[in-house]
Amino acid sequence: MECNRYIRVLLKEPNKKPKIVTIENTLENMQELVNGPIEVIYHKGAFIICNEDGKSKKLEPNLFLEKDMILGSFFMVGDDYENADFISLNNRQIKEFKKEILEEMQREIEMEDDLECEME
């Protein structure tokens, strides 16, 4: 079995654009990135890793994705199904997920603008 000690992920912090980072593929490092215990969510052939306690700790809203709000920082990793491991995202996945996140961020901005206009 190939060891994926370092993996390339797409990190999304609240109020920031997503960025590509290389992380050590350890539980401790993942917990440090999301500031707590991790929750793993399957998403379009990859995984979203976020803080399991994000809602109970009332972390800062980050992104609305698939009918749920992700709170706090999260990152996306590839799925090595055969070896039950996380792997680097490939270039296609990075491009696709970055586009998806940026489009959702734009929708959220437009919704906020619409609400402000209605209140005036």
Q: What do these predicted ranges mean?
A:
Residues E2-N15, K19-E112:
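N-terminal nucleophile
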Residues M111-E120:
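Non-Sec secretion/translocation targeting segments of pathogen effectors
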